[in-house]
Amino acid sequence: MELVQNNSIVIPPKSHIEQSYGPFYSSQDIYDEINIGSESTFTGSYTFAGVQSEKITINRGCNIAGFGVFSRGFCRNIEIHSDANIVGPYSFQYCSYLNSVQVHENCRISGNHTFSGCGIRELHLGRGIKVFGTGTFYQCENIEHLEIPDNAFFDSIFTFAKCVNLKSVRFGNNVILYGHSMFSSCESLEAVYFGDNVSIYGEDNFNGCPNLRIIEHGANFLNEDKTLRIFEKPYKRVRFEEIPEGVECSIRMESFDENSVIAQTTCGHYFNEDGLRNWVRQNDTCPMCRKKMKC
């Protein structure tokens, strides 16, 4: 079977690759892409380890089960399509030139240290992703901002530990985390935002994050990690139709509309949330009545 087409390595759909190492292992040739056809399975190890390729595409429903299949490669971009299953440990470990990773919806990553030590700068995770195992993105030092999508599920340890330049994490809605030390030693981390219906179990998930100052959460937030101390906001979001007619934001001196993000303080006043958030960071009283709002 001819696997090299137009300077790309192309694996046909529904292939089953059992061979370890093989002809492409640490090849000196430079390829445009490694394209794994949909519903293919890899059980061999280090099949494409050390290969120089601009991009790796893993198509829908693939199962990558071997050890280090793409590890130590020189690729810049990885795209993993929906319903793929990355089971094998060290699958992309030490791809130090890697710039962006896009994982589409409903993928499962369960191999230990799948992306550890990679040069990832842009990480896009799809809805419904499931992550298991140890150190999935351990020591990916170039990630600065991270978004965890809606309906994500994590049952893992040291998942993003030692991502030392990570500054902010924003969780979507309906996210469940069972973990230990998931974000430990992320020493640049400053802000974490949890969406609605987020649940956290385990402990030490944000241990060793000395610069973490902002922790905000939405409705129905459940925190069972006793090492993560949450300071409740002195206000809550409300819908436009819930506020009295004619009320204005006294910080920005403007009327609300259907597109406004409105916050109501514990003392009953209404403000634009961004303006109130900035106020609360510097003050401990309501901008309207000066009532003390937090300790």
Residue ranges: model-predicted function:
Residues 17, 22-25:
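Eukaryote-specific detector of the first structured module of a protein
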Residues 2-16, 28-42, 52-63, 73-86, ...:
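Structural signature of tandem-repeat unit edges
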Residues 47, 69, 91, 172, ...:
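Short coil/turn segments at secondary-structure boundaries
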Residues 45-47, 67-69, 89-91, 112-114, ...:
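Consensus positions within tandem repeat domains that build extended binding/scaffold surfaces
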Residues 95-98, 115-118, 140, 163, ...:
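Disulfide-bonded cysteines in secreted/extracellular proteins and peptides
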Residues 242-295:
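RING-type zinc-finger domain of E3 ubiquitin ligases
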Residues 3, 25-28, 229-231, 255:
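Short, conserved catalytic or adaptor-binding loops enriched in Gly and charged residues
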Residues 209-210, 214-234, 246, 268, ...:
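C-terminal capping region of solenoid repeat domains
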